[in-house]
A protein has these predicted regions:
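Core SAM-dependent methyltransferase catalytic element
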Residues: 186-211
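Short N-terminal helix/helix-N-cap motif within the alpha/beta-hydrolase-1
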Residues: 119-123, 150
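A short beta-strand submotif of the Rossmann-like class I SAM-dependent methyltransferase core
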Residues: 111-114
């Protein structure tokens, strides 16, 4: 592999990182996902949880309020990092495809609207598999292709894939699918006030294997 070429392409992707900022829509949806999918898992309060692509910390806030303290948010956005740290969260500035986290140490990775930002999702998923403990869980939420807002063309979106492709990648990376679902929401075009649907894929995955 030509490492210098890789660095060049990788730096292009890094240059397109953007701040999530405050979003009431994403905040309310994150709360719903936590209540409907994460809390029923009944993870022990000492569970080590990573929020990859943590944004301004909506998930971290909910988990902290529920009594979880072993939480780390991952982001490359300096603004989002600052917001999260102001709320008392531990945040690490790193690429979520190359985690400075020990092997088999994490109990849950929460990857809501982050995996579509990876130029190489198979590599990213292999990295998640590496850091997850045997039998540990990965939550993935991603936009669907060819939706009204055409997420394929958003800045820093590289992997807006169909359901079957995601399922194939999960299997290849060593994950067992526990939940394979979707959620459709009604959004409003702020310019025209027209309503339109938007669908996201929801997956809860479990690590297969012991190392």
């Amino acid at each position: 592999m030509d490492i210098e070429k890789f660095k060049k392409y990788y730096n292009v992707a890094l240059s397109q990182v953007y701040d999530e900022g405050n979003s009431p829509f994403h905040k309310s949806l994150t709360i719903k996902i936590v209540n409907d999918l994460i809390m029923p898992l009944q993870l022990p309060k000492e569970a080590f949880i990573l929020d990859v692509g943590c944004g301004p910390g909506y998930f971290l806030n909910e988990m902290k309020s529920a009594g979880y303290s072993n939480l780390i948010g991952i982001t490359l956005s300096s603004k989002d990092k600052e917001i999260c740290e102001a709320s008392g969260h531990q945040i690490r500035a790193m690429d979520f495809s190359f985690l400075d986290v020990p092997d088999s140490s994490v109990d849950l990775i929460f990857a809501r609207h982050s995996l579509e930002h990876s130029p190489f999702p198979f590599i990213t998923l292999q990295e998640y598999w590496r850091v997850l403990a045997p039998g540990a869980l990965l939550y993935v939420e991603v936009p669907t292709p060819s939706d009204t807002r055409r997420h394929e063309f958003n800045p820093n979106h590289y992997s807006v894939l169909g359901r079957d492709m995601w399922l194939a990648l999960f299997a290849r990376a060593g994950f067992k699918v526990q939940t394979n679902s979707s959620i459709t929401l009604e959004l409003t075009n702020t310019n025209t006030q027209e309503r339109f649907p938007e669908t996201y894929y929801l997956f809860l995955l479990q690590k297969n294997g012991n190392s």
